[in-house]
């Protein structure tokens, strides 16, 4: 079942990030980010999916508004993850469908995402639900301490 993510979900979100995305995240940072991002509904769309028995978050999609000089308004998916114990049950597809419904209802022209080259299962999933790979690129980052 869909629901909003809140600070009490930080442990589950951190665990999903670790086991599904291979991101080692600090629970306290996840709490801060949940509080910050869920209060910015004009820029961040965060949809959680809970286990109906335990009421715990087992998946989520997080997207941010994307607009530039060269594109119409779109959504950039920053994260889509489902606890591996629940993968293969249509939860990722339901989350994406919910996000797509949001996009259509809000006159958003496209949804885009980046996916690491090694995540071939994810690539197959996205292609299966109608997404196409339109370019391969490198990511550059500069970290400030």
Predicted segments with their positions:
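Acetyl-CoA-dependent GNAT
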Residues: 4-11, 15-73, 78
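Short hydrophobic/aromatic beta-strand or adjacent loop that forms the aromatic wall/cage
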Residues: 43-46, 135-139
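Conserved acetyl-CoA-binding loop-helix of GNAT-fold acetyltransferases
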Residues: 82, 88-101, 124, 128
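Conserved acetyl-CoA-binding loop of GNAT-fold acetyltransferases
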Residues: 127-136
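Conserved GNAT acetyl-CoA-binding A-motif
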Residues: 96, 103-115
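Conserved beta-strand-loop-alpha-helix junction that forms the acyl-donor binding cleft
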Residues: 113-122, 141-144
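Conserved acetyl-CoA binding element of GNAT-fold acetyltransferases
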Residues: 73-84, 138
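Hydrophobic adenine-recognition pocket in adenosine-nucleotide-binding enzymes
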Residues: 5, 80-82, 115, 131
